[in-house]
């Protein structure tokens, strides 16, 4: 019976053809049922209810503050289940304002952080695979070109050891936007981890989005975030 499940896994992902170690000690029934390969291991990858195949919605700028009996919106709206979230209020940027100038309004920016941790063994992967074979781990994300600031998006992905703290490999991305010409679209971010050394057991995925409040609230959205483990690795050259 165990052999049948092992054969099913081999047939499903061509593990033997890719040179994946397949020890008999692995619970192949569990591997087949959890399906750890070629699927998104992140929970709730589109918390704003949008996807990158449709242009991001244009913001409605009325310029009218909320009624005095209603508190202003300071946090984004969405379903953030599966994500740990945090908001960091940034100081007002007064650079470039001459001394003595009377300021009526300044935009206030905030970083909104979403993060989650993927347990690779709970997802169905096994020690020999992660330590000896080291399959490719593909990261993808799409963020909205909101034009709220030159820095509106940050990505930080860490491959962690069994203690959930030791960083074995890390990828960060901190782009700067061109605000000279108006553009409002989705921007793709991607990275492939390979040859990352033995010991990886968790993936910590974090991205930060910059929001703005000035009379009204405007945010930067993100969508279709993914962490996918491939049943393959780069060929040796």
Curated annotation (Swiss-Prot):
GO biological process annotation, one example: ERAD pathway
Alphabetic keyword roster: Cytoplasm
Annotated SMART domains: FBA (SM01198)
Main location: cytoplasm
Subcellular location: Cytoplasm
InterPro entries: F-box-assoc_dom, F-box_only, Galactose-bd-like_sf
Protein name (database record): F-box only protein 50
Organism: Danio rerio (Zebrafish)
Gene that encodes the chain: nccrp1
């Amino acid at each position: 019976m165990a052999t049948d499940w092992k054969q099913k896994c081999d047939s499903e992902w061509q593990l033997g053809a890719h040179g994946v170690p397949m020890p008999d000690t692995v619970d192949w029934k569990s591997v087949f049922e959890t399906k750890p390969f070629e699927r998104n291991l992140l929970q709730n990858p589109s918390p704003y209810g949008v996807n990158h195949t449709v242009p991001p919605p244009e913001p409605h700028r009325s310029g009218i503050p909320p009624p005095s009996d209603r508190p202003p919106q300071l946090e984004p709206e969405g379903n953030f289940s599966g994500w740990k979230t945090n908001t960091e209020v940034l100081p007002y940027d007064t650079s470039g304002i001459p001394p003595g100038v009377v300021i009526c309004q300044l935009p206030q920016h905030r970083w909104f952080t979403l993060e989650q941790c993927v347990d690779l063994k709970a997802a169905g992967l096994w020690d020999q695979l992660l330590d000896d074979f080291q399959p490719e781990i593909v990261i993808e994300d799409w963020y909205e070109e909101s034009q709220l600031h030159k820095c509106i998006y940050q990505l930080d992905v860490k491959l962690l050891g069994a203690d959930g703290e030791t960083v074995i490999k890390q990828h960060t991305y901190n782009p700067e936007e061109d605000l000279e010409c108006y553009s409002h679209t989705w921007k793709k971010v991607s990275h492939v981890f390979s040859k990352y050394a033995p010991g990886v057991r968790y993936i910590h995925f974090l991205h930060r989005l910059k929001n703005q409040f000035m009379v009204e609230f405007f945010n930067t959205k993100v969508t279709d975030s993914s962490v996918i483990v491939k049943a393959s690795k780069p060929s040796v050259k």
